[in-house]
């Protein structure tokens, strides 16, 4: 190979070492994609991920995403794809200097904003946490808002201190221990108001059943 050819080959390799492009196809089963760069489309290339050993991550790039092509030795056939670069079609979803912000195609958002120390998850339909041992939340105040119902499906619920509730319905019986104080309303048992019902019979003897 003459000197001119060597220079041209070297220039080609240098041009190909780092290129930008747009993903045009993805093969999720193979973990590969094809990228349009300049006037050509690459072969199926692997994309880079955060971890790929004992701990592994998965976050597939999407069609239309702008990426870098990293070609070792300038050979595009064996290059790797590094997502992603903001573009006019896919601009930055946040302008915060410090926030971690993830926006998904369905509109769901996960964000942690250090300026307000606020973690926000919005736009999701369901959430599931499964633990084989326990789940602990330690916080001064917990607020749960449910428009329909909150279900505690467990053999036992323990409240270690005061319980305040607007209404209470017990369906399968139970026991109470300790002093009970009732004020501000009627307390009835089997249709009889306890503090107003009367008993027939002589006041000096055993009374009858409540009226």
Swiss-Prot record:
Binding residues annotated for Ca(2+), in chain numbering: 202-203
Description of what induces expression: Expressed in the late phase of the viral replicative cycle.
InterPro entries named in the record: Gp5/Vgr_OB, GpV/Gp45, Phage_spike, Vgr_OB-fold_dom_sf
Listed cofactors: Ca(2+); Fe cation; chloride
Cofactor binding notes: Binds 1 calcium ion per spike trimer. Binds 1 Fe cation per spike trimer.
Record region (Disordered): 183-211
CC terms in the record's Gene Ontology section: virus tail, baseplate
Major site of localization recorded for this protein: virion
Protein name: Spike protein
Family, per entry: Belongs to the P2likevirus spike protein family.
Keyword set, alphabetical order: Host-virus interaction, Late protein, Metal-binding, Pore-mediated penetration of viral genome into host cell, Viral attachment to host cell, Viral attachment to host entry receptor, Viral baseplate protein, Viral penetration into host cytoplasm, Viral release from host cell, Viral tail assembly, Viral tail protein, Virion, Virus entry into host cell
Residues that hold Fe cation according to the record: 197, 199
Naturally occurring in which organism (per UniProt): Escherichia phage P2 (Bacteriophage P2)
Quaternary structure and partners: homotrimer.
